[in-house]
UniProtKB/Swiss-Prot annotation:
Native organism: Pseudomonas aeruginosa (strain UCBPP-PA14)
Transmembrane segments: 28-50, 68-88, 98-118, 121-141, 145-165, 205-225, 244-264, 311-331, 350-370, 394-414, 449-469, 477-497
A matching Pfam family: NhaB
Superkingdom assignment: Bacteria
Compartments where located: Cell inner membrane
Protein name: Na(+)/H(+) antiporter NhaB
Reported function: Na(+)/H(+) antiporter that extrudes sodium in exchange for external protons.
Membrane topology: Multi-pass membrane protein
Keyword terms, alphabetized: Antiport, Cell inner membrane, Cell membrane, Ion transport, Membrane, Sodium, Sodium transport, Transmembrane, Transmembrane helix, Transport
Protein family per UniProt: Belongs to the NhaB Na(+)/H(+) (TC 2.A.34) antiporter family.
Catalysed reactions, semicolon-separated: 2 Na(+)(in) + 3 H(+)(out) = 2 Na(+)(out) + 3 H(+)(in)
Signal sequence residues: none
Amino acid sequence: MSSPLSQAFAQNFLGHSPRWYKLTVLAFLLLNPLLLWLAGPVTSAWVLVGEFIFTLAMALKCYPLQPGGLLVLEALLLGLATPEALYAELQHNFPVLLLLMFMVAGIYFMKDLLLLLFSRLLLGVRSKALLSLLFCLLAALLSAFLDALTVTAVVISVAVAFFAVYHRVASGQRASEDYDPATDRQVPELHRAHLEEFRAFLRSLLMHAAVGTALGGVCTLVGEPQNLLIGHEAGWHFVEFFRQVAPVSMPVLAAGLLTCVLLEKSRRFGYGAQLPAAVRQVLAEYAASESRKRGAQQKAALLVQALAALVLIVGLALHVAEVGLIGLLVIVLITAFTGVTDEHQIGRAFQEALPFTALLVVFFAVVAVIHQQHLFTPIIQAVLALPAERQPGMLFIANGLLSAISDNVFVATIYITEVKQALDAGHMSREHFDTLAVAINTGTNLPSVATPNGQAAFLFLLTSSIAPLVRLSYGRMVWMALPYTLVMGGLGWWAVSHWL
């Protein structure tokens, strides 16, 4: 019989993850040294990559930082990579770490302005097809200049606030302190139909906005973290990155927006729900009340945020400094001129990005293993052995399939560094490298909307507080994303294969 202490260790290991998941991770850790001894470092390294992808695919069971971190720690101890190689990877990708540390935090301080923008949109437009199109387009536009995670967080904040307002009224708990929006027990039958329609309405808007972040995120250097990785390797600044990717990103953006309208008109794949008139009236009264409460200080803060957004866009377009440093500039400007000087208030802005920043360091440790064991060299050589006109399309497919089940930052890092090594070795022209870089960028960004695992914004939406409130499950997200996946993936592949 096991002792209480050993039971406590077992319960503490990976927290609330399922028992089968804990045992699987332990099995990986026990298998790797044995495999290294029996099969050698290359086979062992391939298995490690597969194990790490498994932890990414199971991100809803346990955040990948802990199991993935244990795996790469073991890899370093086994000599599959060296700490020096990991440090070299981190130095090489320091601009990406700066982006995650400061740009995401900088946009956090613009949330009030963005919340106001989306709230006005939700109540000001009565046509559901037009509203969905505007949500998708606005999310795309904001993600092109800001950060997809933060844009998604803003849309979630709007949805949570409005859902809670109506749910509280529908359940008759306007003044109740122990109000719980997650339960419908106190919602009378009279309001249940409106509540379910409102849930479907919010689900569709959330999905349109999430897809919009992918449509806009692929277009620019700062739209997604992997874009900065690719742009850094290719030596592209903001305007040059946009120009290189535009032959693929612009047609896909147009097709994605058209898909948005068609889905609302056809009412297929869970789209098309309308905002009930009774719900609109409650939300409009709430918005008017909030507007009346907004004093001179709050209005001044909104003006500062708008000016900081303008500084951000101009700074990015002119590339006055590294992207992360521009994010730090935004933090300083907004906090200084809105009176946010408390250390704990400022610290909240960094909570969202730092766990992912730590996970990115683990990514780079796996990349160091791949480099030191030359794992992807045969694959890249096989692609480069194809006729030049077939290479971009094949890279798009290879990136897309892996990005749909894994993390697109991880996938992009592997492929762009391998292709850059081939360029440095003289195996391709600079022009062809640029074409392959676009294929890698679009391949990791577009088909990855297929599952919540592929896009950080999708995973963030699925694990957020709004998902259970509007009944947005993993399977429902995959189903609602399917038409977008087919259109964006199919047209993206065609554009990469024929228009570059």
